[in-house]
Amino acid sequence: MLLKQTKIVATISDQRCDVDFIKQLFDAGLNVVRMNTAHAGREGFEKLIANVRTVSNRIAILMDTKGPEVRTTVLDEPIPFKAGDRVKVVGNPDRQTTRECISVSYPNFVHDLNVGGHILIDDGDLELVVVEKNADHLLCEVQNEATLSSRKSVNVPGVRINLPSLTEKDRNNILYAIEKDIDFIAHSFVRNRQDILDIKAILDAHNSDIRIIAKIENQEGVDNIDEILEVADGVMIARGDLGIEVPQERIPGIQRLLIRKCILAKKPVIVATQMLHTMISNPRPTRAEVTDIANAIYYRTDALMLSGETAYGKYPVEAVKTMTKVAAQAEKDKLADNDIRIPLDENSNDVTAFLAKQAVKATTKLKIRAIITDSYSGRTARNLAAFRGKYPVLAICYKEKTLRHLALSYGVEAIYMPELANGQEYYFAALRRLLQEGRLQPTDMVGYLSSGKAGTQTSFLEINVVEDALKHAEDSVLPNSNRYL
């Protein structure tokens, strides 16, 4: 069975992505590999993708886009600043940054800011306050001692930056993701539904089934989460930039709100940034980091993400092992009283959602040790994941891509099996395989969700003891060429 039900996303650099390394992370609990387009080129991506697929067809690959970000331009050497220093800021991507003038990549930067506005550079390490606004530049006062290097992030809390959702580099990377059949695209700085639809238009034009994860990194994204969830396939709570764009004391509350919204929408949610930050350079986490992981699970997140810990840290395998152990314990310790109740829409005839809820509820009343579903699209498995059952969901997938699309969903263990003539044969073959692999015992009780009619949504829930079901295997034949499960 699963090491833990919470999924783990790990950022891997093309500088450290050999097969043995990825295999160690996978064995430690890795489910999804994240590729950061800001730090690698095509040659590096080629190597990383090939090595991930060599290790396992179950590891999903998630590619980040840059989105509408603002950065400082290049400079000759790091520049030290002290509190009280005055410096000009201009919006010119082609101008080099100097001690006297910081240039940023957004041409209309001066226009969008006003006197009194705060500019946070390099994740807030360098803070500026606008003291004077001119037609072609801002005059700012430095608030703290810091050293500025090339191409650092620029955030302006509370100010809407009117940049297009997709850069030309993003478009090229999306086309590359389509070519390589990547599983997820995580789009940065999503502000509204249109930001997601811009990517969907590209994917649809190429008949791609890549899933889109919306990275929520500013107040506008938080405010528009409902409309974003209508069109996105999942959400990443990117606490790094979010903690700069909004007051940091609000982050725990926003995290809890976004997780709840995603569960109600039955879409996976990832909590990211500094989960085990000290393990970049230390073999053990702080107690606060352990508690942070546990609290994200108590809030009911689907997945947790590691960034620098696995991309360039000294203890990448230990970080994944630590996260796996903490997650497994937190799943045991979480209180059922805090489960998020998902109401069923009285005006909806969504049989899949209804049966998924009953299947998970049955695990609390009967000795059911797993819920099995055969799935073409993964929809039924994602519905089951939303109800956060105690026991795993075993999703038998017709396509390997579906298997990887479920790599972010809580408690779902996806297994690939070639499509069979009918659903019951599929079910019995799955039971035999799970018995052979030691995942189930003959006396275990299992729930089975499927469809009795070709081309329809999930239509029945069946509960059996494994050995009893297999005794009657030859007597049960139900057609299932389902494309909706």
Features from the language model and the residues they span:
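Non-catalytic helical/linker scaffolds that mediate oligomerization, partner binding
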Residues: 1-485
